[in-house]
């Protein structure tokens, strides 16, 4: 081994020395003052509540929430340039591909105002109508909300819905216009629109660009000044609200909480107040923006808990966590104000390969922890075999759940057409709840009740006529109309939920050239003249194709489905009738023509009686085949007939 001589050793700088810049060359301007001392300040927990600000960003889908959150992460120094990526907080592949936020994410940010260090907890929320429950749970953990509006598009229906959710919880609202760098931006006009709705002055509306970062530091300053600090009693028994929970393959259930009273430390025994289940805390930590273990969480702080529990039903969103280890004991009463999310749409999910049924059950178990609103129960279909009847918040929720099952768990699935929940009163006085057309009672039905929703549509005023026509064709009743500005109008309708869960949104977008936005909320139920339409193949009902539709549109639905199945089902050796029926009454019919083998091909000339004999023999065979033959519906036909597009045709109920 060669060793360099002492002269060479002296001349060569040490590895440590090479890292240190010369005092003369040190650039004192970079990095900014904001970054160095504070990140270490934010990593310490048990921060005084007066120095904490909990806030969320609420906006319509695609108004730039995640991009603004990216700029905040960079500006506060918690993510460096090298590890930065677009939509940093959107962790799922589906979120990144579709450019939407599905899960609410939280992150702890350091910030300094007037030489005082603060900790900001930012909760990035989804904007789509299906994920309103994610927004409501994020709002429970905050004292303030940044209301973000696209300076080129203005206020949309979803913005209003989330704003009302925030006002219900008495959150302080900071109005902000985003995308002011766009050539099409009109900030003055939309600032006046926001001021009109919130009740502030147009000058108070902040203007930022999530893309360039312009105005973001001013926004963070305003969050510190305007959002009230969290209130809570540090000496009271521990109470923390679960606002999200995820399943980690290696660590089990990771529960995200906001501490309201007391404090939480590792190695304590905690209790979930709704179930009474107790666990030992293995780890307590903060998200900044990657998870970091810490000594514990104090009043007003947001972080995560790991108990090592693998059962996905042990950590319910909206539940209250309390500590059993402290001298003060467990809390006497749970936190209030959270509603369990209720499924609005039901659909059957079946594995294409029947042997995947146990895998589908395990996959749904794991997804349910991430997704508090997903419900499911086993069901059997004659046509599709074993599967699950799943409850979803809406059609996008259903599509994304199915896509996650297929992508994350490698399953191949068929989903049946979506249904809402109907209440059916029979003549004998009994009442049943129907989420599946195959549960529809046969015989005398006195009344049927269907869920209705209050729908808000915001669109340019030139499209009023076409929107009204669409809503009336879907049995909607106009509740009111307001002009937000001379160019934009808000329409309020009461509509059956069954009419809007299929293709209403697509039809609305196509009729308004994509300018309309939609929001809906539950509004009870109403009596309706509904019937069950069965699709019969060879005289036998195929349960997967049955649907509950309004009496006036049953004939159109029957026609549409029989025509579609005639194209999708391959021809058999015998003629197959495809019929649509209400009870025993046939309302539509198509025939799938038989494939005919040429039995005369071997007869070259000869007597006609020979040919007739062969044809009669073929006819007898076809007749016998028709009585004993079964129609095999290929998997592709089920997929095509039950796809969302096909369901969209059914939406004309």
Swiss-Prot record:
Keywords: Cell membrane, GTP-binding, Hydrolase, Membrane, Nucleotide-binding, Protein biosynthesis
Domain called tr-type G: residue spans: 50-231
GO BP term, pick one: positive regulation of translation
One CC-aspect GO term: cytosol
Reaction catalysis annotation: GTP + H2O = GDP + phosphate + H(+)
Binding site for GTP: 62-67, 178-181
Main enzyme class: hydrolase
The EC number(s) this enzyme carries: 3.6.5.n1
Disulphide linkage map: none
Domain of life: Bacteria
InterPro entries: EF-4 (IPR006297), EFG_III/V (IPR035647), EFG_V-like (IPR000640), EFTu-like_2 (IPR004161), G_TR_CS (IPR031157), LepA_C_sf (IPR038363), LepA_CTD (IPR013842), LepA_IV (IPR035654)
Database matches in HAMAP family: LepA
Functional summary from the UniProt entry: Required for accurate and efficient protein synthesis under certain stress conditions. May act as a fidelity factor of the translation reaction, by catalyzing a one-codon backward translocation of tRNAs on improperly translocated ribosomes. Back-translocation proceeds from a post-translocation (POST) complex to a pre-translocation (PRE) complex, thus giving elongation factor G a second chance to translocate the tRNAs correctly. Binds to ribosomes in a GTP-dependent manner.
Protein name: Elongation factor 4
Organism: Mycobacterium tuberculosis (strain ATCC 25618 / H37Rv)
Gene this protein is translated from: lepA
């Amino acid at each position: 081994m060669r060793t360099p001589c002492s002269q060479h050793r002296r001349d060569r700088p040490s590895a440590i020395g090479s890292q240190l810049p010369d005092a003369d060359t040190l650039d004192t301007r970079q990095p900014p003052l904001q970054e160095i001392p504070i990140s270490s300040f934010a990593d310490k927990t048990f921060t005084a509540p007066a120095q904490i600000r909990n806030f969320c960003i609420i906006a319509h889908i695609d108004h730039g929430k995640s991009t603004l959150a990216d700029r905040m992460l960079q500006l506060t120094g918690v993510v460096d340039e090298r590890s930065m990526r677009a939509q940093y907080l959107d962790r799922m592949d589906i979120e990144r591909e579709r450019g939407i936020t599905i899960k609410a994410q939280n992150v702890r940010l350091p910030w300094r105002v007037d030489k005082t260090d603060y900790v900001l907890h930012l909760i990035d929320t989804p904007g789509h109508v299906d994920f309103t429950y994610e927004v409501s749970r994020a709002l429970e953990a905050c004292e303030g909300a940044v209301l973000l509006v696209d300076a080129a598009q203005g206020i949309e229906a979803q913005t209003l819905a989330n704003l009302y959710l925030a006002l219900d919880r008495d959150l302080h609202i900071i109005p902000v216009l985003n995308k002011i760098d766009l050539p099409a931006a009109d900030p003055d006009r939309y600032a006046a629109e926001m001021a009109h709705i919130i009740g502030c002055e147009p000058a108070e509306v902040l203007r930022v660009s999530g893309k360039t970062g312009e105005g973001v530091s001013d926004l963070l300053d305003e969050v510190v000044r305007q959002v009230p600090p969290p209130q809570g009693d540090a000496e009271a028994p521990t109470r923390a609200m679960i606002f999200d929970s995820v399943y980690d393959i290696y660590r089990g259930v990771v529960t995200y909480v906001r501490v309201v009273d007391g404090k939480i430390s590792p190695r304590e025994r905690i209790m979930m107040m709704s179930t009474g289940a107790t666990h030992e805390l293995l780890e307590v930590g903060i998200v900044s923006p990657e998870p970091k273990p810490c000594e514990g969480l104090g009043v007003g702080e947001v972080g995560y808990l790991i108990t090592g529990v693998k059962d996905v039903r042990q950590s319910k969103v909206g539940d209250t966590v309390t500590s059993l280890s402290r001298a003060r004991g467990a809390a006497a009463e749970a936190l209030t104000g959270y509603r369990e999310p209720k499924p609005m749409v039901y659909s059957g999910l079946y594995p294409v390969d029947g042997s995947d049924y146990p895998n589908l059950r395990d996959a749904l178990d794991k997804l349910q922890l991430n997704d508090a609103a997903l419900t499911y129960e086993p069901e059997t279909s004659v046509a599709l075999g074993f599967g699950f009847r799943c409850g979803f918040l809406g059609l996008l929720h259903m599509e994304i759940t199915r896509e996650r099952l297929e992508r994350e768990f490698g399953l191949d699935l068929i989903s049946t057409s979506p249904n809402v929940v109907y209440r059916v009163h029979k003549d004998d006085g009994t009442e049943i709840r129907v989420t599946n057309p195959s549960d529809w009672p046969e015989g005398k039905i006195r009344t049927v009740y269907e869920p209705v929703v209050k729908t808000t549509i915001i669109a340019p005023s030139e499209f009023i006529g076409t929107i009204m026509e669409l809503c009336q064709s879907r049995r909607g009743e106009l509740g009111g109309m307001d002009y937000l500005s001379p160019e934009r109008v808000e329409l309020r309708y009461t509509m059956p939920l069954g009419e809007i869960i299929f293709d209403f949104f697509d039809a609305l977008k196509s009729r308004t050239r994509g300018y309309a936005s939609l929001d809906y909320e539950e509004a009870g139920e109403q009596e309706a003249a509904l019937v069950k339409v069965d699709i019969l193949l060879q005289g036998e009902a195929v349960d997967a194709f049955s649907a509950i539709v309004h009496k006036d549109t049953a004939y159109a639905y029957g026609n549409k489905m029989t025509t579609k199945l005639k194209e999708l089902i391959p021809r058999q050796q015998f003629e197959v009738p495809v019929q649509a029926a209400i009870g025993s009454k046939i309302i539509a019919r198509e025939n799938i023509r038989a494939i005919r083998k040429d039995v005369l091909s071997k007869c070259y000339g000869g007597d006609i009686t020979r040919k007739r004999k062969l044809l009669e023999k073929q006819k007898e065979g076809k007749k016998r085949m028709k009585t004993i033959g079964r129609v095999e519906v290929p998997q592709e036909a089920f997929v095509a007939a039950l796809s969302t597009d096909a369901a969209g045709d059914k939406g004309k109920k």
